[in-house]
Amino acid sequence: MCGIVGAIAQRDVAEILVNGLHRLEYRGYDSAGIAIVDQEKRLQRVRCLGKVQVLAEAVAAEKITGGTGIAHTRWATHGAPSEDNAHPHVSGQFAVVHNGIIENYEQLRIDLQQKGYQFLSQTDTEVIAHLVHWVMRNETSLLRAVQQVVKQLKGAYGMVVMDCEQPNHLVAARSGSPLVIGLGIGENFLASDQLALLNVTRRFIFLEEGDVAEITRRTVDIYDVNGHPVQRDSQDSHLTHDATEKGTFRHFMQKEIFEQPRAILNTLEGRLHQHNVLVDSIGNGAERLLEQVEHIQIVACGTSYNAGMVARYWFEHLAGISCDVEIASEFRYRKFVTRPKSLLITLSQSGETADTLAALRLAKEKGYMGAMTICNVAGSSLVRESDLAFMTRAGVEIGVASTKAFTTQLATLLMLVIAIGKVTGNISLSQEEELVKALQSLPAEIEKALAFNQQIESLAQDFADKHHALFLGRGEYYPIAMEGALKLKEISYIHAEAYAAGELKHGPLALIDADMPVIVVAPTNDLLEKVKSNIEEVRSRGGQLYVFADKEAGFTETEGMKIMTMPKVNEVIAPIFYTIPMQLLAYHVALIKGTDVDQPRNLAKAVTVE
């Protein structure tokens, strides 16, 4: 992994490829490379360690030009970050870029070495290049060669292959890692993400599992997993050209934090009428499916998992539907029992998360009554493969640490909870009206939370010399504590953990001292007195407390305990509201620490490998 761009055109494609890589930088990477065939059918390749800008300068210095090319940003999986391990990889006249993991690459490597091939990298991708070269000894068609090669591969891949002897076409293959074809006029493109191509086209074809595609300047031919020609519908992208621009903000994460009121308003739009949730807005046949639901199984990873954990409280408390939440990488590898009338819900920002996709495919074999995804990317694999897709409308999220995707997931989940409760008879009309009013107030309430930006910036100074932090919450605020800890560790590199506050006695209290900041989410609710007891446990052991609560909670700031007094909000939407100060705290601490906020080390935006 991480980013692929390909282009075939009459004009020079070097700038298109480099600009595409720039647009994919948000996904995270450690090295980059480009290969272009010139008019004399010579392969020109440049690879470098570090940022795409370094590659761009090298391409300009070497005056690389040509009408057919491929480019890649790499996030190391096999082999350390290095120029030798950077893509494209070459074997003879063939160049390959690849996202994914080839699980049987070691045996393939041994077989190829016995055939006389020498390996210049530690990557699994170089195996693909040599396999193509080997098959083409007895083959004239690159398309047929790639179709033969993919049959030998086990694992996940999204790849593009280029032949400098036949530069009039590119061949791509997709299994477990996304690829999209961009359609131009007299030119065509390939990428792992449509964002890479927004400056050259708005029309896209999303390849499906097992597809192999051959593109020329004027044609696109796609073949399914069985080698049969297929038609895939094209889609017009509604993403804006400046979707990947920071504007006046210092970082994408900062921009995305402050975009949340609008993102939630967009997510609610057209789905609420007066004080009702429009069940039909969830999708065709939604009401018929939802009224039968007796159990919810949520599967997700990372931030999306935390959103699912909040939703569990809503499903059970508000809609009276039992709900389980599981990490996708665990769910897919265990033997589970499918409950009767159970609906599977997958959560993902990208819709391409490898473990979540695998969990969906497994669950569809195990007798779930239906599969729904809550996702931010139309046309993604999760959307295409699910029975229902309830889309968030967060817009493009560039920062690796998710912000607006998380809160729009929660808003969407709450709408779904209300819809299921209504059609199953567990939520009355008056309850629905109250819940919808709370949802409609959410954008304005988040604006109020964002107004605490400067106060939280000052608070963040206390974390300048800290190496550890503990987050506490009870009930639906425990997952918000989890999200706060995740954000802090992701972008500030402070070791942060979250615990249900009632678990303090069972281990975490041993960590408490004056150097351990303890962040507590403690708004007024039925569990407040329990949380206060937990806070006293920390105070009595000399811990430094930072409590986020409303005025009615009755906290008084004392030595060793700072209070961030927040406005009182409706209890149902309060978990979403209290997410905002957690995001702001993580952001400002990361600024103080001097880390790369938008592209934290070792992390990628879309995890398309296991």
From Swiss-Prot:
Residues 285-426, 459-600 form the SIS domain. GO terms for molecular function: carbohydrate derivative binding; glutamine-fructose-6-phosphate transaminase (isomerizing) activity. It catalyses: D-fructose 6-phosphate + L-glutamine = D-glucosamine 6-phosphate + L-glutamate. Gene3D superfamilies: Glucose-6-phosphate isomerase like protein, domain 1, Glutamine Phosphoribosylpyrophosphate, subunit 1, domain 1. It is found in: Cytoplasm. Its EC number is 2.6.1.16. GO terms for cellular component: cytosol. The active site is at 2 (nucleophile), 605 (for fru-6p isomerization activity). Keywords: Aminotransferase, Cytoplasm, Glutamine amidotransferase, Repeat, Transferase. Residues 2-218 form the Glutamine amidotransferase type-2 domain. One of its GO terms (biological process) is fructose 6-phosphate metabolic process. PROSITE patterns: GATASE_TYPE_2, SIS. InterPro entries: GATase_2_dom, GFAT, GFAT_N, GlmS/AgaS_SIS, GlmS/FrlB_SIS, Ntn_hydrolases_N, SIS_dom, SIS_dom_sf. It comes from the Bacteria. Catalyzes the first step in hexosamine metabolism, converting fructose-6P into glucosamine-6P using glutamine as a nitrogen source. This is Glutamine--fructose-6-phosphate aminotransferase [isomerizing]. The gene is glmS.
